[in-house]
Amino acid sequence: SSAASDVYKRQVVINDNNPAFNDADFTTISFESYGELDELGRCTTAFANIGKDIMPTEKRGAIGEVKPTGWQTAKYDSVDGKYLYNRCHLIGYQLTGENANEKNLITGPRYMNVDGMLPFENMVADYIKETDNHVMYRVTPVFEGENLVASGVLMEAESVEDHGEGVKFNVYVYNCLLYTSDAADDTPC
């Protein structure tokens, strides 16, 4: 569909869109797991099997008290939402209800959060709401050297009950600061 192809314009598909889950990972029991922060205080992998039973039923609370590595406040009138940087949930709030969990928040520009990650999160949430099935979901921030801000995130998902027929992706979403919203090609950012 054109909506699905629009999602991929600023991302790179990894391994022909096949996630790297092990067969043993698949279950119909919902869970969520957040890796320990590394020695520099950076997030590591967030992993979940998302079902309706762990999706939130209330609006997200404040997350301003969490200062992920590399955090800075930068406000510009020309940026949609005014703030250049967002606290980006590795696993979006709408999926597991994790709010101000420092193991689930990284610094990223609004573009990566809203245009990069959110369409994939919405795809998963919509599928679960429509089918009541589960989706294996893993997001891994990728840091270069000792950088405190991730260069991007690896997002993997696969629907469980229908073996990936409903949702299946493995994409790297760039942490982009500068971009042109009218780019006609598939050049990242």
Segments predicted by a language model, with ranges:
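N-terminal module-boundary/linker segments of secreted carbohydrate-active enzymes
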Residues: S5-D23
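Short, small-residue-biased leader/transition segments that mark boundaries at the very start
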Residues: A3-Y8, D182-D186
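N-terminal low-hydrophobic presequence detector
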Residues: S1-S5, L84-Y85
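Domain-level detector of nuclease and nuclease-like folds
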Residues: F21-S181
